[in-house]
Amino acid sequence: MSRKASEDVEYTLRSLSSLMGERRRRQPEPGAPGGERSLLAAESAASLQGAELERAARRQFQRDETPAFVYAAAAFSALGGFLFGYDTGVVSGAMLLLRRQMRLGAMWQELLVSGAVGAAAVAALAGGALNGALGRRSAILLASALCTVGSAVLAAAANKETLLAGRLVVGLGIGIASMTVPVYIAEVSPPNLRGRLVTINTLFITGGQFFASVVDGAFSYLQKDGWRYMLGLAAIPAVIQFLGFLFLPESPRWLIQKGQTQKARRILSQMRGNQTIDEEYDSIRNSIEEEEKEASAAGPIICRMLSYPPTRRALAVGCGLQMFQQLSGINTIMYYSATILQMSGVEDDRLAIWLASITAFTNFIFTLVGVWLVEKVGRRKLTFGSLAGTTVALTILALGFLLSAQVSPRVTFRPTAPSGQNATCTEYSYCNECMLDPDCGFCYKINSSAVIDSSCVPVNKASTNEAAWGRCENETKFKAEDVHWAYSFCPTPYSWTALVGLVLYLVFFAPGMGPMPWTVNSEIYPLWARSTGNACSAGINWIFNVLVSLTFLHTAEYLTYYGAFFLYAGFAAVGLLFVYGCLPETKGKKLEEIESLFDHRLCTCGTADSDEGRYIEYIRVKGSNYHLSDNDASDVE
C-alpha cells in the first residue's frame, strides 16, 4: 500500500476510534435504570460497528492494491468458461452442414448434440474427487488438454463415429472445467472482488456462445468443410489456457488443506500484494482445522453433507438453482435459437443463423451488466429479479407463438398420394399442425401476400429442401414456378415476435440466472465439502441440460410451440418461489462466514437478510453466541 494510502487508513481509523469513544460517553451510567444492560448493549454495538467500519475502511483503501496477478488468474481460468460456451453453442450451426455431408439421421444428430453434454455431466459428477485429489490447477490443466485433443479430432474427423468420439472427449473437458473454474476463482479472489470475478466465468461462457454464433454464420457459406473450422477452432483457447496455467499457482486454500502451509502463505501474499494476510490466513487455517474434525467421521463426503443440516441445506439450494436455471429454458434458447427463429417463420437458414447471433450477443452484453450488478445489488435480489423477468419473457414468447398459430394458413389443396406413398401428411388441416410432424412440409403459393393453393405433403428423406412427391418434389423446378416450400416453419406476419421474445428473455436471464447459480455454488459450501458440492450441483446442471435439450423438439410436437414455452414459464415461476424462500444473501461475506447462513430452516433462510435494516447481530466469543436483540439495539440509540 502506498504511503499516502497508509496515512489515509490511519486517519480514518483514528476518526472511527474518536467517534466510538464519543458514542460511549453518551451512554447512561451503569447505576441508572437499565443502565448496565444498555451499556453492555451499547458497547457490544459500538464494538461491532467499529470493527465493521474498520474493515470497510481498509477494504476501501486496499481495493486498488489488488495485484494484476489475481485478474490474470481469473482471466485464464475463465477461458474454461469460453470453451464451455463455444463448444456447446457451435454445434447448432455445424449440424446444418454435417447432416447433409454425412447424411446424418435424427438419431445421430441427437447423439452428436447430446454426447458432449452427457459426457460433461459425468465429468462434473466425478470432478469433485478429481480436483480434491489433484488440486484445482491440475484439474484445469487436464480440462484444457482434453478440449484441445477433442477439438483436433473433430476437425479431422472422416466419419460420424470419429465425430462422436471427439464430442465425448470435448464434453469431458468442459465438464471438469464447469465445476473447477468457479471454485478456483473464488479461492484466489479477495472477498470484495470474489462475486465479480466468479461472474466473469459466466461472461466468458456467454462470450464463447456469441463467438460461436459468429463463426457459424461466417463458415456457413463453406458447404463442404465449414463445419471443420467451426468445431476445430476451439483448440485455440484451450491451448492458451493450458500454457497460461503452467505459470499460475495452486489455490492457497487447497494447499493449506494438504499441509503445504509455507507455499500457501507465499502464494496468498503474492495474490494480496501489500495487504496483510495474517487474518485471512488464520481464518482459512482455523476453518480447515474445524472442518477436518467434522470430516473425520467415516463415510463418503456426500453422505456427511447430507447428514449435516447446514451442508444439506446448502446442497439443496445449490442444486436447486442449477436445476431451475436449466428448466427455465436457457439451453433450449441457446441450442435451438436458429430453429426457434425458423419455427416462427424465418425461411432462409443463413438468415436464421445470423439472427441467432443477435440473441447470443444480447446474452453476452447483459452478462456484463450482471458483472457490474452482482456486488451492488447482491446475489439474492439479482437472482429473484432475473427469474421474475424470465417468467414474463417466456410468457410473451409463448403468446407470440400462440398468435402465429391462430393465424396459421389453412390447407386448401389435398393432392392424391402416389401408390405406396405415405398419405398421413395430407390429413392435416393447418400449417402449424403440419409443421409439428417432422415427416411433413408445407407447399404453397403466394398471391398479394396471401397464402393460396396450400398443401401438406411428406418431406424428401434425402433432403428437407423438397417434398417426397407433388408440386414441391423438385427444388429447382418448383422455385422456377413460384411455388414455395416450408419445412419446420409456417409463413406468418408475426415472425418478428420470436426474435423480440428471445431478446427480452436474455435481457432478464443473462444478468442473474446465468451467472448466479455458479457464483452462489462457489461460496456456500465449507472447504471439506466444496469440491463435492460443486461437483453435485454442476452435475445437476448438466443432467437437466441434457433433459431439456433432448426433449424440446418432442415437447413442441406434443404440446405445440407455445405450449412448450408456457411449460418453461411455469418452471421459472416455481423457481421464483424457491429463490424467495431459500436463497440467503452472501454478498461481502467471507467464505468461512457463509456456513452459518444455513443454520436456519430451509424455508426461512432466504429471509434472514442482515441488509434489510435489522439490528440483530451474533457475536462469537470463545465458542459462545451472545445475542443482541432489537430492544437492546434500540437502547443504543
UniProtKB/Swiss-Prot annotation:
Membrane-spanning intervals of the chain: 66-86, 115-135, 138-158, 168-188, 202-222, 229-249, 314-334, 353-373, 383-403, 498-518, 539-559, 563-583
Membrane topology type: Multi-pass membrane protein
Reactions catalysed according to its record: myo-inositol(out) + H(+)(out) = myo-inositol(in) + H(+)(in)
MF terms in GO: ATPase binding; myo-inositol transmembrane transporter activity; myo-inositol:proton symporter activity; protease binding
Any one GO CC term of the record: plasma membrane
Cytoplasmic topological domain residue ranges: 1-65, 136-137, 189-201, 250-313, 374-382, 519-538, 584-637
InterPro entries: MFS_dom, MFS_sugar_transport-like, MFS_trans_sf, Myo-inositol_Transporter, Sugar/inositol_transpt, Sugar_transporter_CS
Pfam name, any one: Sugar_tr
Span list, region Disordered: 16-38
Keyword Ligase (UniProt): no
Record localization: Cell membrane
Example of a GO biological process term: positive regulation of amyloid-beta formation
Superkingdom per UniProt: Eukaryota
Residues recorded with modification Phosphoserine: 6, 44, 47, 629, 634
Glycosylation sites: 422, 447, 474
Keywords (A to Z) from UniProt: Cell membrane, Glycoprotein, Membrane, Phosphoprotein, Transmembrane, Transmembrane helix, Transport
Main localization (coarse): membrane
Extracellular side stretches: 87-114, 159-167, 223-228, 335-352, 404-497, 560-562
Database matches in NCBIfam families: SP (TIGR00879)
Family: Belongs to the major facilitator superfamily. Sugar transporter (TC 2.A.1.1) family.
General function of this protein: H(+)-myo-inositol cotransporter. Can also transport related stereoisomers.
Record protein name field: Proton myo-inositol cotransporter
